[in-house]
Amino acid sequence: MTQKRPYEHRKAQKQVKNLESYQCMVCWEVNSKANGHHLIPYSEGGSADIQNMMTLCPSCHTKYHKGELKIDIHRF
C-alpha cells in the first residue's frame, strides 16, 4: 500500500508538473492528470524535490512501473 506523502512532497510534485506544463517527458502528451515521477524512487531514498522528478502522463507512468518502459535518468 502506498503511504500518504508529506505536504512538501506533494507540493514538489505539483511544482514539477507546472514547470513542465503537465507535458509528459516521454511521449510529450499534455495531460491534466499527469504524474510527478521520481527519477530515483522515493522508496529507495530518492529526494522529494523537483530535481528528482519529471512529469509523466498516466499511461507512461503505468508502463514504467510495469517494466514496459525504460527511462534514462541521466537524460534529465
From Swiss-Prot:
Keywords: Hydrolase, Nuclease, Oxidoreductase
Keyword Nuclease: yes
Keyword Nuclease: yes
CDD domains in the record: HNHc (cd00085)
GO MF assignments: endonuclease activity; nucleic acid binding; oxidoreductase activity; zinc ion binding
Superkingdom assignment: Bacteria
EC number: 3.1.-.-
InterPro entries: HNH (IPR002711), HNH_nuc (IPR003615)
Domain HNH: 24-66
Signal sequence range: none
Family (UniProt): Belongs to the HNH nuclease family.
Protein name: Anaredoxin
Organism encoding this protein: Nostoc sp. (strain PCC 7120 / SAG 25.82 / UTEX 2576)
Phylogenetic placement of the source organism: Bacteria, Bacillati, Cyanobacteriota, Cyanophyceae, Nostocales
